[in-house]
Amino acid sequence: MGCIVGIDYGSKRTGLATTDPQQIIASSLASLPTTEVLSYLKTYCKEVNVEAFVVGQPLQKDGTPSAIETEIQHFIGQLKAAFSECAIARYDERYTSKIAAQTLLESGIKKKQRRDKSILDRISATLLLQSYLDFKSNML
């Protein structure tokens, strides 16, 4: 069984998370400029057996797609072209950034560190992926 990589896509920065090979626990992987994500994933996939990607689906409160969805669809097209052997799933990422920010606040991390968007991106990607894993395990 291979790992699953979670992707919290952003216009400027993208957070990445990964699972253990048994696909039970999600862990933070990286936060990168979005322009570097595909290159990073190509290198990562040479080192680690990745079987699927979960890309966050940013929905509005009323369930309609967020404005960034067009960019995400373009990115998914690139992801499919580069990793045709991997499955790509979408998962609702509503509130992951707010939960990540609250987690940072409650963890006692200093304000200066909480302002580091890369930490927030990684936590959001991890929350997205863990939520997906929990959903998937409840479906069995």
Located regions from the model:
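Phosphate- and other anionic-substrate recognition elements at nucleic-acid/protein interfaces
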Residues: G2-I4, S11-L140
